[in-house]
Amino acid sequence: MVRWHPAALAVVIAIGLVACGSGDKSGTEGGARGSRRFGTIASPCGPGRASGATQLGVTDSTITIGFGDDSAAASSPGLNVEMSEAIRAMIDWCNEQGGIEGRRLVGDEHDAAINDVETAMRSACARDFMLVGQGWLLDDAQERTRLACSLATVPTFAVSERFATAPLMVQPSPDPPESVNAAGAFLLAAAYPTKVRRAATMQGNQPTARAETARVVGAFEQAGWQFLPCEQEYNIGGEANWVPFVQRLKDCGAEVVHFSGSMRPTFEEILRAARAIGFDPIWMQEASVYDSDLAAWNSEGLADNVHFQMTYYPFEQADRVPAVADYLDIMRAAGAPAGLLGAQAVAAFLLWAEGAKACGSDLTSDCVMRVLKNVSNYDAGGLQSPTNPGANLPGNCAMVLRVRGTRYEQVLPSDIAIQACDRTYRVSVGR
């Protein structure tokens, strides 16, 4: 391990002095136009006099960071490619301003194609200073290699419990197994106190899906939800007929259903089956709904009762949230697609860049990790609601969106572009 340099201990970084609202757009010039701000925070990028080949991937003039996705997977072409597109765009955005303390950023892309994550990690270990904004589905398989080469990372997300609680890792939107931001569950319980006492779950027949459902139930029960004994488990590869599943939910008296699984075709077929038997519960989905084509698909109104929690501000609120406007401007200038995972990758990049800037000429991965472990209140300039990356804890703020026609709209809280915050919204669950 590289030793921590004492000079960096004196650095105090103010990352995201935040409130639960979206902030004022005044003073933001737009990220794509070379502005020195991103949302409510000063850009961490710019000229400087940092120098020294302090670690693999660092020279007097450059910093090489790895990033990547699973987009070459034969089973899911293009999987999560928006993360890599976002990191490339942010590298260009940062270099246009002078890099990090004068060092130009060099991107090194690694495509794990789902099953080749260990190969991708070996490649990163051989060349990169740190991994930034990557996300691989089988991240459990990377950890022996990553930790053996002491490769620190600020990923977009963590899938496995092993990686989500690993050393040498800080992420902008922590999701550790024992702590849940259940703000959406609390908000729905306040809005529909009777309905949430007749809730049910539906998930695929995989151990990870069962574990996640148990985690959801444990968290939501603390928000006042009560779950009926009619959990539905389906074949992850699909079912020939979805009517029996939704019929059992209807017969059980479920008024709210928490669904976990793929959007297309699984959830769309379930919604169609529910319409066929006149079953219209509140569906509670995951935030990944926002990145799907569900709203565009919903021309018949089958998804009009689908709700989901968001801790990132939706793109429809760009006129009210400066960070969202800046993110969209940067992606547009780069010709890159905008997406929820892309926004989360940008949050990871900005968090990493703050740490790298703080270290200056003493740039090592230990230095960056030490700086980031002291970040307890981070909102990526208002792109998301506040989290505690240093302690690996999620936030306690969120909004609830729903599908209405072919659009997404905020329904809770009623004040648009405001997230509801309460310390009780973050709950502990058993592992």
Question: What kind of feature is each model-predicted range?
Answer:
Residues 78-85, 96-167, 233-243, 264-268:
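Beta-alpha junction/loop-to-helix N-cap segments that form part of ligand/metal-binding clefts
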Residues 205, 213-217, 263-269, 315-373:
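Extracellular/periplasmic ligand-binding modules, especially the Venus flytrap/periplasmic-binding
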Residues 174-175, 273-346, 414-429:
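Extracellular/periplasmic periplasmic-binding protein-like sensory domains
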Residues 16-19:
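C-terminal motif of bacterial Sec signal peptides marking the signal peptidase cleavage site
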Residues 21-24:
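Bacterial signal peptide processing site
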Residues 128-232, 282-307:
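Extracytoplasmic ligand/sensor domains, especially the bilobed periplasmic-binding protein
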Residues 34-52, 56, 376-431:
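Solvent-exposed, acidic/polar segments of extracytosolic/periplasmic ligand-binding ectodomains
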Residues 27-124, 260, 341:
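N-terminal extracellular/periplasmic Venus flytrap/periplasmic-binding protein-like
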